[in-house]
Design a protein with these regions (language model features):
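Vicinal oxygen chelate
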Residues: 31-34, 42-43, 77, 86-127
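Core segments of cupin and vicinal oxygen chelate
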Residues: 2, 9-52
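N-terminal beta-strand motif that seeds the catalytic metal site of vicinal oxygen chelate
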Residues: 1-17, 72-75, 124-127
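Helix N-cap motif at beta-to-alpha junctions
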Residues: 14-15, 80-83
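Short, charged/polar, Gly/Pro-enriched secondary-structure boundary elements
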Residues: 49-53, 118-121
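Short, charged/polar surface micro-motifs in flexible loops or helix N-caps
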Residues: 48-51, 62-64, 82-84
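Short amphipathic alpha-helices within nucleic acid-binding modules
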Residues: 21, 83-88
Length: 127
């Protein structure tokens, strides 16, 4: 039986570009470690999340992009100010898939963006 959720891994095409995107969302780099001569793993976390969950960004030497498939959808992160988060991302050329919206009248405000490798990230501001 599983006892703890540890991390989500994304395979990325360029380390610094992906790290910068997640830093813009508030993630911090926890550790960067080479895996022999095959890959580099960068573990990132949000302040206050403790040891887990972590986002693992894996760069495999010699691979520029990956087929994302259709089964996976997104990760979700809470933001304190959705408008200012989107403004900061827009400066870097990252725009929402569609304008922010609420799923119910008093519900959270949400929108989706894509990271530099095309992975969807849901941004959620409490209602």
């Amino acid at each position: 039986m599983a006892t703890k959720y540890l991390h989500t891994c994304y395979r990325i095409g360029e380390i610094e570009r992906s790290v910068a995107f997640y830093e813009e969302l508030g993630f911090e780099e926890v550790v960067r470690m080479p895996i022999r001569d095959e890959a580099i793993n960068v573990f990132m976390n949000l302040p206050g999340d403790g040891d887990v969950p972590r986002l693992e960004l894996t760069y495999n030497h010699g691979v520029d992009s990956y087929e994302l498939g259709t089964g996976y959808n997104h990760i979700a992160v809470a933001v304190d100010d959705l408008e200012s988060t989107l403004t900061g991302l827009a400066v870097k050329g990252i725009n929402p898939e569609k304008p922010p919206y609420r799923v119910s009248e008093n519900g959270p405000q949400i929108c989706f963006v894509r990271d530099p490798d095309g992975y969807r990230v849901e941004l959620i501001q409490a209602g």
